[in-house]
């Protein structure tokens, strides 16, 4: 009986560690975020979806690729599409269930309403694990557009903010 009680206490003490285990080198993750808006008559609608795949280099460093797709539908006009593909690197702080991160991304933007061009910028976000493999993520990205390396410095101040909220899964 004493041995059973000791094992039960040990198991109860280790359970939170197992549930809140941080990703390790080689762990992969996928995320999915979305947003949308319409006017009151649904004559103009905007839908955005963003997904990513990444792999941890260690428990703090994550690199990967992000894909954004935007669909713009306005009554009387053809539906317009926009996309952005970029590689990213994020550094995560801490080891608990809530981990802030900072990072940067570089890639391209393309579509019907934009000039095909390069984009880059810093990002900051937060991940909160609800169990060992599933998390909620929020992020703010500052993206600026440029056609060449020499133009990047000139256009940095003319960037835009991109917000996302989504779910992620580690495997």
Positions of PLM-derived features:
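Sequence/structural signature of outer-membrane beta-barrel proteins
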Residues: 35-41, 68-76, 94, 106-113, ...
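Residues that define the transmembrane beta-barrel architecture of outer-membrane proteins
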Residues: 26-28, 43-49, 79-85, 98, ...
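Residues on the lipid-exposed face of transmembrane beta-strands in outer-membrane beta-barrel proteins
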Residues: 34-36, 51-55, 87-91, 104-108, ...
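Outer-membrane beta-barrel channels and translocator barrels
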Residues: 25, 58-60, 93-98, 129-133
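Cleavable N-terminal export/targeting peptides
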Residues: 1-27
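Predominantly the C-terminal beta-signal and adjacent terminal strand-loop region
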Residues: 26, 69-75, 128-171
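Short glycine/proline- and aromatic-enriched beta-strand/turn motifs that initiate or cap beta-hairpins
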Residues: 20-71, 160-171
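Helix-adjacent hinge/juxtasegments
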Residues: 76-107
């Amino acid at each position: 009986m004493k041995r059973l009680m000791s094992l039960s206490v040990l198991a109860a003490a280790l359970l939170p560690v197992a549930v809140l285990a941080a990703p390790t080198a080689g762990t992969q993750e996928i995320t999915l975020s979305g947003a949308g808006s319409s006017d009151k008559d649904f004559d103009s609608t905007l839908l955005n979806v963003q997904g990513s795949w990444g792999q941890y280099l260690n428990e703090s460093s994550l690199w990967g690729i992000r894909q954004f797709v935007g669909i713009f539908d306005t009554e009387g006009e053809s539906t317009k599409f926009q996309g952005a593909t970029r590689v990213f690197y994020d550094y995560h702080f801490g080891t608990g269930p809530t981990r802030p991160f900072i990072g940067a991304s570089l890639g391209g933007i393309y579509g019907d309403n934009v000039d095909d061009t390069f984009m880059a910028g810093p990002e900051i976000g937060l991940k909160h694990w609800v169990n060992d493999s599933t998390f909620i993520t929020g992020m703010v990205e500052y993206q600026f557009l440029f056609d060449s390396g020499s133009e990047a410095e000139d256009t940095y101040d003319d960037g835009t903010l991109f917000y996302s909220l989504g779910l992620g899964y580690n495997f």
